[in-house]
Amino acid sequence: MNNNSRNNENRSTINRNKRQLQQAKEKNENIHIPRYIRNQPWYYKDTPKEQEGKKPGNDDTSTAEGGEKSDYLVHHRQKAKGGALDIDNNSEPKIGMGIKDEFKLIRPQKMSVRDSHSLSFCRNCGEAGHKEKDCMEKPRKMQKLVPDLNSQKNNGTVLVRATDDDWDSRKDRWYGYSGKEYNELISKWERDKRNKIKGKDKSQTDETLWDTDEEIELMKLELYKDSVGSLKKDDADNSQLYRTSTRLREDKAAYLNDINSTESNYDPKSRLYKTETLGAVDEKSKMFRRHLTGEGLKLNELNQFARSHAKEMGIRDEIEDKEKVQHVLVANPTKYEYLKKKREQEETKQPKIVSIGDLEARKVDGTKQSEEQRNHLKDLYG
């Protein structure tokens, strides 16, 4: 029985596969496309009118009444419909359709004075007969009351964003943006810039400028030109006047000193001139080494102390020893910091000077115990 049931199942699967292959050949379909790609989703809106009566989620695709075979992958075809963008080729730039940021005015229904107490228009949709908390419409974020200029009583009208925009327009990051405030800010900046240029000191023109030789001569004479152009004495009283900064021609860059010398003392990478105060040349590597400062100097001193302490303890570099790890600075930084600090304190600590009189025996000072106190202590402690 089991073998017969298996054979029947195999025959049914073979027949079903043959049937599907035959249908795919007739409809010119690719049988290797999975079902979740071939089937149209339930929310797909571009189904042809001939297929409206049929559920789009079926595997089989119907043919049109005229005999044409419909595209079973129509929901994967990108077509420009209803003003949508054609994004088949994303490598080419395309101009968008723009954002329609429009509003529509919703005026409340006219009501009598008698009904105005019991009825009020909705601030959300603008209709009368219910309040905003009872409104069944979708809550709108952009709500605004604007005066109605056409009305004599100046009744308010509700300004609501238009809802006929497509999804791309509503989800755009610039949706609802108005550049009016930014334009006003830019115009204010331009006005301030023009006023600043107009109010700038006009005396600073080409006539007040002079060459470098004249500047050096004026500095040697302790004179300088003020904002008007007249010469002033260089003293503390006239220090607030206009004065230009100058640089003497005798000044020259430090790297120019190496032009006629065989050695180059200027380091272009660090832009420093090699001097004895900055560092020295290493004899082994023939490289210029800067003097250590700050934490680098402290680490170097601590490393030297660790090396000397290891030699005192009998540790040698050429001999392999398990205890060598205990005398490495990297493995024991806190230990050597403590030892170095302790040794410095011992060196700076002055020996205490004790006189001979302090070491001599002295007579005991104090109150002598009475016989009664001795007997009492003897009874307590035996």
Curated annotation (Swiss-Prot):
Location relative to the cell: Nucleus
Effect ascribed to mutating residue 122 to A: Affects the ability to associate with the spliceosome. Loss of growth and in vitro splicing activity. Cryo- and thermosensitivity
UniProt keyword Disulfide bond, yes or no: no
Protein origin, superkingdom: Eukaryota
InterPro entries tied to this protein: Slu7_dom, Splicing_factor_SLU7, Znf_CCHC, Znf_CCHC_sf
Effect in UniProt of substituting residue 217 to K: Abolishes the interaction with PRP18, and temperature sensitive growth defect
Region (Interaction with PRP8) residue spans: 200-224
Biased composition (Basic and acidic residues): 46-58
GO annotation, biological process: generation of catalytic spliceosome for second transesterification step; mRNA splicing, via spliceosome
Processing and modification events after translation: N-glycosylated.
PTM sites of type Phosphoserine: 120
GO cellular component: Prp19 complex; spliceosomal complex; U2-type post-spliceosomal complex
One Gene Ontology MF term: pre-mRNA 3'-splice site binding
Record note on quaternary structure: Belongs to the CWC complex (or CEF1-associated complex), a spliceosome sub-complex reminiscent of a late-stage spliceosome composed of the U2, U5 and U6 snRNAs and at least BUD13, BUD31, BRR2, CDC40, CEF1, CLF1, CUS1, CWC2, CWC15, CWC21, CWC22, CWC23, CWC24, CWC25, CWC27, ECM2, HSH155, IST3, ISY1, LEA1, MSL1, NTC20, PRP8, PRP9, PRP11, PRP19, PRP21, PRP22, PRP45, PRP46, SLU7, SMB1, SMD1, SMD2, SMD3, SMX2, SMX3, SNT309, SNU114, SPP2, SYF1, SYF2, RSE1 and YJU2. Interacts with BRR2, ECM2, PRP18 and PRP22.
Swiss-Prot/TrEMBL domain comment: The CCHC-type zinc finger probably plays a role in the ability of SLU7 to bypass the requirement for PRP18.
Record family assignment: Belongs to the SLU7 family.
Protein name: Pre-mRNA-splicing factor SLU7
